Amino acid sequence: MPPPLPLLLLTVLVVAAARPGCEFERNPAGECHRPPAADSATCVDLQLRTCSDAAYNHTTFPNLLQHRSWEVVEASSEYILLSVLHQLLEGQCNPDLRLLGCAVLAPRCEGGWVRRPCRHICEGLREVCQPAFDAIDMAWPYFLDCHRYFTREDEGCYDPLEKLRGGLEADEALPSGLPPTFIRFSHHSYAQMVRVLRRTASRCAHVARTYSIGRSFDGRELLVIEFSSRPGQHELMEPEVKLIGNIHGNEVAGREMLIYLAQYLCSEYLLGNPRIQRLLNTTRIHLLPSMNPDGYEVAAAEGAGYNGWTSGRQNAQNLDLNRNFPDLTSEYYRLAETRGARSDHIPIPQHYWWGKVAPETKAIMKWMQTIPFVLSASLHGGDLVVSYPFDFSKHPQEEKMFSPTPDEKMFKLLSRAYADVHPMMMDRSENRCGGNFLKRGSIINGADWYSFTGGMSDFNYLHTNCFEITVELGCVKFPPEEALYILWQHNKESLLNFVETVHRGIKGVVTDKFGKPVKNARISVKGIRHDITTAPDGDYWRLLPPGIHIVIAQAPGYAKVIKKVIIPARMKRAGRVDFILQPLGMGPKNFIHGLRRTGPHDPLGGASSLGEATEPDPLRARRQPSADGSKPWWWSYFTSLSTHRPRWLLKY
């Protein structure tokens, strides 16, 4: 006779209560390590090195995985995974994922109570970071299960990434009654900068987004805010512009100008400003306010007005980032002496990678290879002038020697676009900041000012299609806060006018006779020994000064096409010049390459600057799943564990 139902239920409950806790290793389905229902706990100091930058200082044992001591936590495969995530994912999603994991391994404890991390934070990170795990054939870690170890906002959760986001400080909060278009003209810490950029992108989500191009040596995100009618997508014949600030950590004016510019573009777009709406609907604009956030922290520690001339200039590796790019200018001068040799899109020499390359520098170079930038400006401080390439003298022994590029006329036009509408650059007073440049109209060839190698502007011009100028915003590298509003007023129109010059010259699409786009076709201009190449969609942009130009389009396997182009002096938009290439009967050998350069492996990955496929990346290749069923390459990180190896990371 079966027992009565209440007695049966009681028996089941007793057996379940007596059942020993399981280990995840034995139960991959995940039916173990469930957090205890009670949230009361005894708080202890947080002592995990990998979690030292968490937003709290106290935790408790057992943790949410039932680890009962520091020794058990540090010996666990979960903790080892957090320790090596940065290397495994090449900096992607880190430190975000690491801090998320810390919230499980070392839960937040306050006043004798455990606080759980928010589920929506976990879900948001998983959506963004899942592709990074898929790329290395690794399963999503079980202890980052958003439904098991995380909870809802209405249950009193907290944001484990709040320290990264930078909480809204009292002096950052906007006074009540002010419109959302209000801009606070103050210095921004790293956390405040990130918060403002993300908040701005959220307000203008239909025309803006933020994204990271990498991390600094100390792990800070190199955060970009983009403005476009279709954020995140390159549109056919829509030119790409980038503005970069704070390459030297103690030169902070450019950093603040770009933070203000981001807010201004968003606000004016929402207010219906026709100029800004037209600009964002026809241009894709990328703003990187701080290329050197680590150096900024050093400079900011001394404070505005007290900063030394060089304190914080370099990055955390003590590298000057504007001397850290490949020296392609020396190679250009050599090639310029060789008849028929191409002196544009010069590949990065292999020996460059033997030296110390900053992660910030590498991130910028990879960014350039990813997006077909047309125009760029790097914002500095310490003088009041606009300089343009070349920055390295054609005679290395000469520290000051006029060394023009083949596009000298266009670079002068771009520089004047900034300087001519800047009230202080046009000030005729001899006592003004940067008075030495008055007779030159506040613009100068870089090498004619002072010569140096490894600069970012020369690299842009010689490795890509992008034309970059350098803007010195003022003689004070770290201006006091009260000077920032005036500085913005002086530079706002110059910044807008400069960005608008990307719509000068010609643009178009190169296709074959079937209408298929021709990628990496060369666009040459007679009399200017510097070609540009078409983007993957076959579109191109050629910045040109007013005048009559003979333009040639050519590609391997096609006959060249020549067109005469007239650009009127008052033309404010790029003229459209399309090319249809006809195939050659004799094949690609009729295409004139100049000196063929088959450079060595490019550590940045992807296509080379000449558009040719590079050799396979051995690092990328090893990340593919093994056909023979052996363990993936990352398994070696966990072989030191005698037991409890993380089989839960394996997909097969």
UniProtKB/Swiss-Prot annotation:
Domain of life: Eukaryota
Tissue: In placenta, it is present within invasive trophoblasts and in the surrounding extracellular space. Also present in amnion cells, but is not readily apparent in the extracellular matrix of this cell type. Present in normal pituitary gland and neoplastic pituitary gland (especially POMC-, GH- and PRL-producing adenomas) (at protein level). Widely expressed.
PROSITE patterns associated with the record: CARBOXYPEPT_ZN_2, FZ, PEPTIDASE_M14
Cited InterPro entries: CarboxyPept-like_regulatory (IPR008969), Frizzled_dom (IPR020067), Frizzled_dom_sf (IPR036790), M14_CPZ_CPD (IPR034239), Peptidase_M14 (IPR000834), Peptidase_M14_domain (IPR050753)
Residues bearing carbohydrate: N281
Domain annotation Peptidase M14: ranges: 186-502
Chain spans, region Disordered: 595-629
E.C. numbers: 3.4.17.-
UniProt keywords, alphabetically: Carboxypeptidase, Disulfide bond, Extracellular matrix, Glycoprotein, Hydrolase, Metal-binding, Metalloprotease, Protease, Secreted, Signal, Wnt signaling pathway, Zinc
Cofactor: Zn(2+)
GO biological process: peptide metabolic process; protein processing; proteolysis; Wnt signaling pathway
The FZ domain, residue ranges: 27-160
GO cellular component, one term: extracellular space
Regulation: Inhibited by 2-mercaptomethyl-3-guanidinoethylthiopropanoic acid (MGTA) and guanidinoethylmercaptosuccinic acid (GEMSA). Inhibited by chelating agents such as EDTA and EGTA.
GO molecular function, one term: zinc ion binding
Protein name: Carboxypeptidase Z
Organism: Homo sapiens
Binding site for Zn(2+): H248, E251, H380
Pfam families assigned: CarboxypepD_reg, Fz, Peptidase_M14
Disulfide bonds: C43-C109, C51-C102, C93-C129, C118-C157, C122-C146
Main location: secreted
pH behavior: Optimum pH is 7.8.
Broad enzyme group: hydrolase
Residues annotated as catalytic: E472 (proton donor/acceptor)
